[in-house]
Amino acid sequence: MQPLIDYARSFRQQTAARPEEFARLAEGQAPQALFITCSDSRVIPSLITGARPGELFELRTAGNILPPYDPEQPTGEAATIEYAVEILGVRDVVVCGHSHCGAVGALVRGDDLTAVPAVRDWLTHAAPRADGTKADGDPAIADAAQSHVLAQILRLRSYPYLARRLDAGQLRLHAWFYEIHTGTVLAHRPPADTFVAHPARPVRAAPP
């Protein structure tokens, strides 16, 4: 913990080199995308995308799970999505799953989650394996995690305000998958119904 505290103490001095950027952020935000991903500490949206402060509106949940739309039972997840789209006018929504996912792995293996009832109940919102079989190992978990991302994309389409914008061509949904062990970001391609690596492009240099 101490290294984190030390960095926080010095952050003000580090930002002093870019006063205009941070002053501009105080005037408001206009993020390019809503980035929905897992709470896993190994998945860092700004690191994966090279986003600067103010460019991503983030929603992180255990297993990048989204609850079903229910106007009678509002959730923090639904409120975050609604705010990003209806108030901030975000036109792109990314759901990014990842390899070695603990939540999906627990579902695939059929782990006993009695000791963590909140986790157990939250995972009921996830997409189980379509074939209902128990599998294990990184490839099986990766396959299930990719299917899970697509299930969450489908769930987003059931949110009425998102459906309206999708029908009007005002919103795009993106299904991504991040390989922790390689750093590769895959995107789902509907025609082939497969996840493929993003084509290489010049990389924006990281800030000093």
Regions found by a protein language model. Give the residues of each.
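Thiamine diphosphate
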Residues: 26-32, 40, 52
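Short beta-strand segments
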Residues: 36-38, 60, 94-98, 174-179
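Catalytic core of membrane glycerolipid acyltransferases/transacylases, capturing the structured
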Residues: 41-62
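Structural motif
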Residues: 32-34, 55-57, 91-94
